[in-house]
Amino acid sequence: MSDQNALLNQLVGQTDLLAQVARYSAGRLDQALQLDLARYWADELTKPRNADPRRLVRFGFKVFSQCDEDGIIQEIFRRVGTTNRTFIEFGVEAGVECNTVKLLLDGWRGLWLDGTATNIANIRTNFSAFFDDGRLQALEAFINAESINSLFEKAGISGNIDLLSIDIDGNDYWVWKAIEVVQPRVVVIEYNAALRPPLSLVVPYDPKARWNGSSYFGASLEALVRLGREKGYRLVGCSFSGANAFFVKDEVAGTHFLDPATAEEHYEPSRYFFSALTSGHPPQPGPFVSV
């Protein structure tokens, strides 16, 4: 362990929570900023709002996800269990930093979709072992509400699946609304944290939409909560980074999650700077050998 990390652990490693913060914060940032961010995260997670053990943000950590989604997804399925351990994720880019790589390593199978040919080529190279054993498919496709169901059918996936993850920086709301071919038990979807509750807003649908890097994208958390209710889902939490919301099918959620299932209760503001943090060395997916 480097002197820098030893100092960090000494300063913030007094409890399990703070040790988690130290691990989460180690990586790309200089020592002073690591310490500042570690203290900030620790302070936020130890506030009364986050004291309830049902609050998912307490369980976040990063392995291959952009921020703390890996830990939250793990905790959701610890509570509700799994069925066919099948996922679909779109907007994966090159697959190195997304919400389902850890699931692949945990033995899941699924489908990735991305609209860029070079990303799909890199996925086929970097994840060749998962293609070889038949657990991963990847399709190059520009995703919109008109195409999404046929893409699932092309991949031979329909009916119940355990997880759907949506991050396309634009039409996320409209694409989720259009999905009929699959019925995921859990949905992870990006929300626009600039549009705080109670605002219920979504950008108008444009099948050719591409994100321009501004705050004009996607849907507010309240808009997604309302759509979720229409589709039979309840909001169970948001990532600490304020990037993703987590929904669970009503009949699956039971009493496992914090009430009320409202945007006001679960909203997290944008802390996108946490995407600069790593879980250690630069990410490199397996294959690993299970022993």
What does each model-identified segment do?
Residues M1-E44:
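Extended alpha-helical segments
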Residues L18, A32-G81, I88, V96, ...:
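Rossmann-like AdoMet/SAM-dependent catalytic core
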Residues V57-K154, L163-I166, A193-R196:
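SAM cofactor-binding core of SAM-dependent methyltransferases
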Residues D106-G107, V182-Q183, K231:
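Short, structured coil segments at secondary-structure junctions
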Residues G134-Q137, W174-R210:
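A short alpha/beta connector and helix-capping loop motif
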Residues I148-S158, K177-E180:
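Short amphipathic alpha-helix with an adjacent loop that forms part of the alpha/beta core around
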Residues G159-S165, V186:
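Short SAM/SAH-binding signature in class I
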Residues S165-V175:
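Active-site glycine- and acidic-residue-rich loops that bind
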